[in-house]
Amino acid sequence: MSKEKFERTKPHVNIGTIGHVDHGKTTLTAAITMVLAKEGKASATKYDEIDKAPEEKERGITINTAHVEYETEVRHYAHVDCPGHADYVKNMITGAAQMDGAILVVSAADGPMPQTREHILLASRVGVQYIVVFLNKSDQVDDPELIELVEMEVRELLSEYGFPGDDVPIIVGSALKVIENPEDAEATKCIYELMEAVDTYIPTPERPVDKPFLMPIEDVFTITGRGTVATGRVESGVLKIGDEVEIVGLKEEKKKTVCTGVEMFRKLLDQAMAGDNIGALLRGIQREEIERGQVLSKPGSVKPHKKFVGQVYVLKKEEGGRHTPFFNGYRPQFYFRTTDVTGSISLPEGVEMVMPGDHIDMNVELITPVAMHEGLRFAIREGGRTVGSGVVTTVSE
């Protein structure tokens, strides 16, 4: 059977459910698909189908993730749900499932628990800026004042991690009651309220095309009589012939040049857009002035940095990672976009060592500067194999 064509009529947004184990993330995911399926905007997915999420490999790390998709009147959503806590940690740090926003599920009967806090912290670190809260299991709480108390606790917790706790939409309901009575308007009302909040509170993300031009350089070659060509996949923005671009990274100084030609599949283009694999002809640049691992970018839009703070997941032995812990001053390679750069690690105060399977904040100092920004993903490698995966949380200098 041929694949269905993806109809792009509505804006697309990636979201996911986060929260403590057994607070009802998967039940809520199933409930959303059931309610929207009645309007032909989703195919109903049962709890068991989501719960036995298939294993996926992202940068060599095994992650269980379930993906469902559905629509509202205004948008198309891809929704991720992870069965285990470790899967969430890996997912959010590796960016295996990018989230534009998240639905934080908190049991009204229990209130915020340790993983509630940990998921909020992770979301703030990896750049998930928008959270909508679903207070689940409200059918198990008789006293409305208790629900109000839990709501206050959740708002305080969100504020503690830099989210606008007072403004975050909080919807109260019971996902299980929805699944048991999908025809009951009173039970399903909470799902409509939740989707309304997600539609309005989580903004449509800026498309890569609308961001400044950036292309990581994968290869460089010379065309006799024409000049130097840099090839790569355009990460964001648009490049037109005659545009001024900057070559950034690996060297202390940036170089400016003009793009005098754009080629794709040996055809000449007027312009290249995010997602295109291209060759860019650069005026007056010598072959030795540019190399893989640098980026071509809109002048002034990116800076090269040597020091940064990263949130890192360290692979377990079973995932092909290290068998032993590492200590302060560990010097692996950091793989950004297209190249490895050696860097040394300093661990947070009070942390003596890092074990395989841990996730941790670390300060890194690279030996040469790399074009980077907050939210950029990287891998940590040792002798060509990946031993960790991370995301830049703060750029220092």
From Swiss-Prot:
Q: Which stretches of sequence are listed as region G1?
A: 19-26
Which portions of the sequence form the region G4? Answer: 136-139
Pfam families recorded for this chain? Answer: GTP_EFTU, GTP_EFTU_D2, GTP_EFTU_D3
**EC number, as in UniProt:** 3.6.5.3
Q: Could you tell me what reaction this enzyme catalyses?
A: GTP + H2O = GDP + phosphate + H(+)
Localization (cell):
Cytoplasm
Designated name of the protein? Elongation factor Tu
